[in-house]
């Protein structure tokens, strides 16, 4: 079959277009080669992207060596950590759709044949994934890689707010969340807070724990759309250079197979099937990934026209054990430790041994996932290439440069009984790291990262404390108005109600800093940062702005949460709920809106709110809401 690009490069009538292509550097010999789009997300605003500036051209040169033509463009990238806790967070989730659209626009406008996605942080990988599945042309995902964990002498500053002693005897490992928690703890001096702040984020790369960015970059491996090591190999390590070069070679091979051999098995929709989405979700549950991944996998499946819904996630969550507890669930381990233990393919191998994966699926780099697992499982001592890749260690030097160090661990972590990654027989818990809860407060579901919930509060009953903005909830926590036994409810913060479905990292972090991390719960129709832990339940659907029952909860109502049985209910009769709904509906134009909230919402955000949907659908866009 013809290359897509022939539309703009072939025939007499395209002389004008070819003239413009020539002005970009193309020559006679380039017409007829596959044109590969490189979607780079370099920006100096985001540590996960600050090192990407020259990497697109590195991939481009490799594409050209392999017989393709490379054309790079950029997308935006929002740093959720910098946007957190103020009106900037309203823009984070909407940026996902903007990124997806921008990739679609550039690829389709210029008739590109294939796509390399250079992503990294929270909404960029999901946005590019949505675009890739929408476009359905050959694609390779290559992320910028994780940040090294921060490290500081444990005896000198701060204290651990985690579920276990994380000092390791001498060194306390840090990340962004530690800086936030300790800053809110009045018992820690300004000097100590400054020292922690200066140490928490030492290098370029996506934040160092199993937060949203790293979770999503791991899931692209499980979907079969990224190379082994993509989710865990540090941004600073020289071995990551080879992943970028391999991405360039791989995409040309995929493009030629698609167009010259008419092989549709290389297309993203042929790879990211329902079985592949189930594999990705199984991995997500086993590694205790961010709850945001649920939102993004649902949205990606929607773009792929795959029937993958919340009930599938609920079903999977009941049968997958927790095989990894990584920050924020445990400060003992960060992504550098996951990599040392074999990364994503170590987890996939353990899940395969437990009979929990479908491995008869293609990937961009192997005929089947089974073949890939057999090659990249470090538990096989004969897998020398895998063992060499996963020995990559942190450099321990502050830097914003990619590939700037080549340190190695003295040994791999192959301890599947008590190491970072466990076998199913030695799982952290039989119940996985994510769960979907249902009940009269969230009829279409809500989600919780169970890997971060202490066993003592898996079943919790408390009184509702109602807030209609994140800011008001934060103020109440910091003013000591929240006490043990409270269920903090933050509503009208969903995709429509916010708009933009803000992350609630500050409220949960401040609860922990006040010593209430095991004494309170938080429920919202908004969402949580991947850095959140504790009894933090988000994505309540339908959201309050769409008539969800979370909008009917009243101050002092009793809320019962039962994670083992997957339920969440307000202990209010059906009759009382019906009466409350009738009263709410009677408010006319003021119904299902915050009673009093002063928030500027720009036209761009109003447009997003007009078309978005609740979290149980992935907060995807539904243009029928505005079509006439």
Swiss-Prot record:
Summarize where [2Fe-2S] cluster binds, as residue positions: 121, 207
Any one Pfam family match given in the protein's UniProt record, by short name: ILV_EDD_C
Any one GO molecular function term? magnesium ion binding
Q: InterPro entries, per this entry?
A: Dihydro-acid_dehy_C, DihydroxyA_deHydtase, DiOHA_6PGluconate_deHydtase_CS, ILV_EDD_C, ILV_EDD_N, IlvD/EDD_N
Q: Which residues form the signal peptide?
A: none
Q: Spell out the PROSITE patterns in the cross-references.
A: ILVD_EDD_1 (PS00886), ILVD_EDD_2 (PS00887)
User: How does the cofactor attach, per the note?
Assistant: Binds 1 [2Fe-2S] cluster per subunit. This cluster acts as a Lewis acid cofactor.
Keyword Methyltransferase listed: no
EC number of the protein = 4.2.1.9
Q: What is this protein called?
A: Dihydroxy-acid dehydratase
Instruction: Read off the lineage from the record.
Output: Bacteria, Pseudomonadati, Pseudomonadota, Gammaproteobacteria, Moraxellales
Q: Which gene encodes it?
A: ilvD
């Amino acid at each position: 079959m013809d290359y897509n690009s022939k539309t703009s490069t072939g025939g007499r009538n395209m002389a004008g277009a070819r003239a413009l292509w020539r002005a970009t550097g193309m020559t006679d010999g380039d017409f007829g080669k596959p044109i590969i789009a490189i979607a780079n997300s370099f920006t100096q605003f985001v540590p996960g992207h600050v090192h990407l500036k020259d990497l697109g051209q590195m991939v481009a040169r490799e594409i050209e060596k392999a017989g393709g033509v490379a054309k790079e463009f950029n997308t935006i990238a929002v740093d959720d950590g910098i946007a957190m806790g103020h009106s900037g967070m309203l823009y984070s989730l909407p940026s996902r759709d903007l990124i997806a659209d921008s990739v679609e626009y550039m690829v389709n406008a210029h008739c590109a044949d294939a796509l390399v996605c250079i992503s990294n942080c929270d909404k960029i990988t999901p946005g590019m994934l949505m675009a890739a599945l929408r476009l359905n042309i050959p694609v390779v995902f290559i992320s910028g890689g994780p940040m090294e964990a921060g490290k500081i002498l444990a005896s000198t500053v701060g204290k651990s707010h985690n579920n276990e002693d994380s000092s390791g005897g001498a060194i306390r490992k840090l990340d962004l969340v530690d800086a936030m928690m300790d800053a809110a703890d009045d018992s820690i001096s300004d000097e100590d807070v400054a020292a922690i702040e200066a140490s928490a984020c030492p290098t370029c790369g996506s934040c160092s724990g199993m937060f949203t960015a790293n979770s999503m970059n791991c899931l692209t491996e499980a979907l079969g759309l990224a190379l082994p090591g993509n989710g865990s190999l540090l941004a600073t390590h020289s071995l990551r250079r080879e992943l970028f070069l391999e991405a360039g070679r791989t995409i040309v091979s995929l493009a030629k197979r698609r167009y010259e051999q008419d092989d549709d098995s290389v297309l993203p929709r042929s790879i990211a099937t329902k079985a592949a989405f189930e594999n990705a979700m199984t991995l997500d549950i086993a590694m205790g990934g961010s709850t945001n991944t649920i939102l993004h996998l649902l949205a990606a499946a929607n773009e792929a026209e795959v029937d993958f819904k919340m009930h599938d996630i609920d079903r999977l969550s009941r049968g997958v054990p927790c095989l990894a507890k990584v920050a924020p669930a445990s400060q003992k381990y960060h992504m550098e430790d996951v990599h040392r233990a074999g990364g994503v393919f170590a987890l996939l191998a353990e899940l395969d041994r437990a009979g929990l994966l479908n491995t008869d699926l293609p990937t961009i780099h192997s005929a089947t996932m089974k073949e890939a697992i057999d090659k990249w499982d470090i538990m096989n001592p004969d897998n020398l290439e895998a063992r060499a890749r996963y020995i990559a260690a942190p450099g321990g030097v502050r830097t914003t440069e990619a590939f700037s160090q080549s340190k190695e661990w003295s040994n791999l972590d192959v301890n599947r009984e008590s190491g970072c990654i466990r076998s199913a027989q030695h799982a952290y818990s039989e119940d996985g790291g994510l769960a979907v809860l249902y009940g009269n407060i969230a009829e279409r579901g809500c989600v919780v990262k169970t890997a971060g919930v202490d066993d003592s509060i898996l079943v919790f009953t408390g009184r509702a404390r109602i807030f209609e903005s994140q800011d008001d909830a934060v103020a109440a926590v910091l003013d000591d108005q929240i006490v043990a036994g409270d269920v903090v409810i933050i509503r009208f913060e969903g995709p429509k109600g916010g708009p933009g479905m803000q992350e609630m990292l500050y409220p949960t972090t401040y609860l922990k800093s006040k010593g209430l991390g095991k004494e309170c719960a938080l429920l919202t129709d908004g969402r949580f940062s991947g850095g959140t832990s504790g009894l933090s339940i988000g994505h309540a659907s339908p959201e309050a702005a769409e008539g969800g029952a979370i909008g009917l909860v009243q101050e002092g109502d009793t809320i019962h949460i039962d994670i083992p049985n997957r339920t969440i209910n307000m202990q209010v009769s059906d009759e009382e709920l019906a009466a409350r709904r009738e009263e709410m509906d009677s408010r006319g134009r003021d119904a299902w809106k915050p009673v009093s909230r002063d928030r500027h919402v720009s036209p761009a955000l109003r447009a997003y709110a007009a078309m978005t949907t609740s979290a149980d659908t992935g907060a995807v866009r539904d243009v029928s809401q505005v079509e006439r």
